Amino acid sequence: MANSLDRLREHLKNGDKLVLKNNEGQSTDDITKATMVETLSSDGSTQDSFPLNEETEIEIDGSLVQLRIIVHCWMNKDSSAADYLADCQNKQLTNVSFLQRTDLINWLSGNTESSQYLKAPGQKGETSDKVDIENKTLAGELSTVKSTTSASLENDSEVSDPVVVETMKHERILVDHNSALRGAKPINFGYLIKDAELKLVQSIKGSLRGSKLPPGHKGAHGRISKTNGSSGGPRKDPIILIPSAASSILTVANIKQFLLESKYVNPRNLPSVPNGLVNIEKNFERISRPIRFIIVDNTRMFTKPEYWDRVVAIFTTGHTWQFNNYQWNSPQELFQRCKGYYFHFAGDSVPQHVQQWNVEKVELDKNKRFKDVEVVRYFWHSLEKELISRGYR
């Protein structure tokens, strides 16, 4: 018996091929129908043959196994644990666990000179009483190959070796599998669902609105149509973005006085505003309720994409670095999506690149402050049309 196993091992070490034979001496791929296994050399000649029902000196789960199990294990040496386990289930053969299978394959191929499962005295393999504990209910619990394979690998770690047991007593579990995958910082991604829903609704509404427009019509100001939610529900305050540059004509320091009191004051003569944010409220003739605007000179608080949907106007100085942290860095794309304004003093030339942008040029007089009323009235009238195009009523 041991000689048959040793002879088979020598053939496998030499690279000989295994061929299964049935009772009639014909080749077969089904090991359950085979009765013999033959070894073929590289030139195709038969070297040796072995009965598959012969009991070997390999002990698995406390009992000696037939050569059929060893051959089946070898023929599936390149199969995954899941595929091998499924094949054992289909053919009703003893399942050799992953660690046991690895040990046997290494011994049969000659990679190792011993196997802890070889029980015959005097053989090159170790005489060992170590028995790996396998899950006896794997066959009935094969709801999925994946879960059963996981259970098999888990049980392989339960050994009765006193050295291993003693070593495991001194182990400290720093992190388990689930904790490593979960991470240490809990993050709630629920807001992404709301953002996705908002984007989806806006996309659908935009498509419906665009389909009702006459051919060739692009909407107000020839820009890409954007909505800000359902016209029947409550709306969040619209946002006006202004430059943060100290050289800008309008800053958070003087914007409120300019838009509400129609009076321009040089921002250098006014104290700075903390946080770069001011709020103003404005009544419009064609909108039924007062609109409260948030005016900011930066996008640090734009933590969600929906904030950009609320931007109804952008003031620019003509410097492209102003748009570095914007959702759209290109002025051409930015002002196709958002209403743009370029405020400048009368007599100052408008840069050539600004003239190519889709922005409204608004002129201020340097000295005649009584003209500020007309300028502010023009701005609010322009912005009112923008709000109405976005669904404000």
From Swiss-Prot:
Q: Which residues carry this modification: Phosphoserine?
A: S114, S150
Location of the protein in the cell? Nucleus, Nucleoplasm
Show the GO cellular component annotation of the record: Cdc73/Paf1 complex; euchromatin; nucleus
Record region (Disordered):
210-235
Q: Which UniProt keywords apply?
A: Activator, Nucleus, Phosphoprotein, Transcription, Transcription regulation
Molecular function GO labels: chromatin binding; RNA polymerase II C-terminal domain phosphoserine binding; RNA polymerase II complex binding
Query: Does the entry feature the keyword Nucleus, yes or no?
Result: yes
Name one matching Pfam family: CDC73_C
Give a yes or no for keyword Phosphoprotein in this entry: yes
Q: What is known about what this protein does?
A: The PAF1 complex is a multifunctional complex. Involved in transcription initiation via genetic interactions with TATA-binding proteins. Involved in elongation. It regulates 3'-end formation of snR47 by modulating the recruitment or stable association of NRD1 and NAB3 with RNA polymerase II. Also has a role in transcription-coupled histone modification. Required for activation of RAD6 ubiquitin conjugate and the BRE1 ubiquitin ligase which ubiquitinate 'Lys-126' histone H2B.
Protein name listed in UniProt: Cell division control protein 73
Source organism (scientific name): Saccharomyces cerevisiae (strain ATCC 204508 / S288c)
